[in-house]
Swiss-Prot record:
Family note: Belongs to the UPF0502 family.
Record PANTHER family: UPF0502 PROTEIN YCEH
Xref: Pfam families: DUF480
Domain of life: Bacteria
Protein name: UPF0502 protein Geob_1184
Organism: Geotalea daltonii (strain DSM 22248 / JCM 15807 / FRC-32) (Geobacter daltonii)
């Protein structure tokens, strides 16, 4: 992508797309409705707790990046919509897949089909794969296939509006509990060895003083 979005912008954009596809009768969205959509607990990973100020700042940034618009200016209540149709010429299947990736993060083809059904009907897995291939073939690409995770059969796909995600291989794995225990034990043993050396020095000094004291009476 030629723009990079932060976490809040990603959530706002994904929510706008989702509501257009699932509840078109209530779209475009007011600020209050959009904030509620961003914070809803279902179909979100992670669940966020944004306030209206954070959503407004994200909207301003998305408008500057030509990804969102104020709809029906001059109306009693300002309403907002995404601008992906105008900017990127995306069709409903592509929008549904992108919305799911924006709202939940990297997912497999199977997960995208199951979860994306509420926004657009996908007859089978090849239909999802075709959409993903189209999104990856764009210039710049909107989606990428991630390296397969150890122990997982299927690859996951990620949106690129927020830049390339860090793969598991690139992340520093958290220390294993057993390894942490070994490190702590080694540190404790090291401290004990230092104390033993110190005590031996004190004992040797005491012996020397005792010998000096005894020599005074010989």
């Amino acid at each position: 992508m030629d723009v990079t979005l932060n976490e809040v912008e990603v959530r706002v954009l994904g929510s706008l797309i989702e509501k257009e596809l699932t509840t078109p009768e209530y779209y475009p969205l007011s600020l209050n409705a959009l904030t509620n959509a961003c914070n809803q607990k279902s179909n979100r990973d992670p669940v966020l707790n944004l306030d209206e100020g954070e959503v407004v700042r994200a909207l301003d940034s998305l408008k500057f990046k030509q990804l969102a618009l104020l709809s029906g200016e001059g109306g009693r209540v300002p309403k907002y919509r995404h601008a992906l149709m105008e900017k990127l010429r995306l069709d409903p299947p592509e929008l549904a897949v992108l919305a799911e990736l924006l709202l939940r993060g990297p997912q497999t083809v199977g997960e995208l089909r199951t979860r994306g059904e509420r926004m657009h009907p996908f007859p089978d897995l090849p239909a999802i794969e075709e959409v993903l291939e189209e999104l990856m073939a764009r210039t710049p690409a909107l989606v990428m296939r991630l390296p397969r995770q150890p122990g997982r059969k299927d690859s996951r796909y990620a949106q690129l509006f927020a830049g390339e995600p860090q793969t598991a291989a690139e992340q520093s794995p958290p220390p294993e509990a057993a390894r942490l225990r070994v490190v702590a034990e080694n540190e404790r043993i090291g401290h004990l060895e230092e104390e033993v050396v110190h005590l031996r020095g004190e004992v040797a000094e005491l012996r020397r003083l005792v010998e000096e004291f005894k020599s005074q009476f010989e």
